[in-house]
UniProtKB/Swiss-Prot annotation:
It is found in: Virion; Host cell junction, Host plasmodesma. It comes from Cauliflower mosaic virus (strain BBC) (CaMV). Its main location: virion. Residues 1-31, 38-59 form a coiled coil. The keyword Disulfide bond applies. GO terms for cellular component: host cell plasmodesma; virion component. GO terms for molecular function: DNA binding. This is Virion-associated protein. Keywords: Coiled coil, Disulfide bond, Host cell junction, Virion.
Length: 129
């Protein structure tokens, strides 16, 4: 099984191959840009590029070694999973009756003297409306 240095070397080789292919792609695009490209020629060039990249990736021996290394990982996780947080504050509904709020017609208060809308001024208050 390869160690990390060997894998790093192979990955850097693939990276350099990809960079050289990038310059080749630029050259091809410049060549195609100088001509009047057709859709078929562009598709053929794109298919060739995809095939070349796929072949490079599939032929790389580091892929097999990486998969083997991943398969040989220990079953126990080396990283501790975060513990579940407690429930924290329980912010439920009010536990006391909120008399004096709500609308009796809507059933939101058990207080028969709850304020209603439109507001009806109590006797003795000036009439604002």
């Amino acid at each position: 099984m390869a160690n990390l240095n060997q894998i790093q070397k192979e990955v850097s080789e693939i990276l350099s191959d990809q960079k050289s292919m990038k310059s080749d792609i630029k050259a091809i695009l410049e060549l195609l840009g100088s001509q009047n490209p057709t859709k078929e020629s562009l598709e053929a060039v794109a298919a060739k590029i995809v095939n070349d990249l796929t072949k490079l990736i599939n032929d790389c021996p580091c892929n097999k070694e990486i998969l083997e290394a991943l398969g040989n990982q220990p079953k126990e996780q080396l990283i501790e999973q975060p513990k579940e947080k407690g429930k924290g504050l329980n912010l439920g509904k009010y536990s006391y009756p909120n008399y004096g709020v709500g609308n009796e017609e809507l059933g939101s208060s058990g207080n028969p003297k709850a304020l209603t809308w439109p507001f009806k001024a109590p006797a003795g208050w000036p009439n604002q409306f």
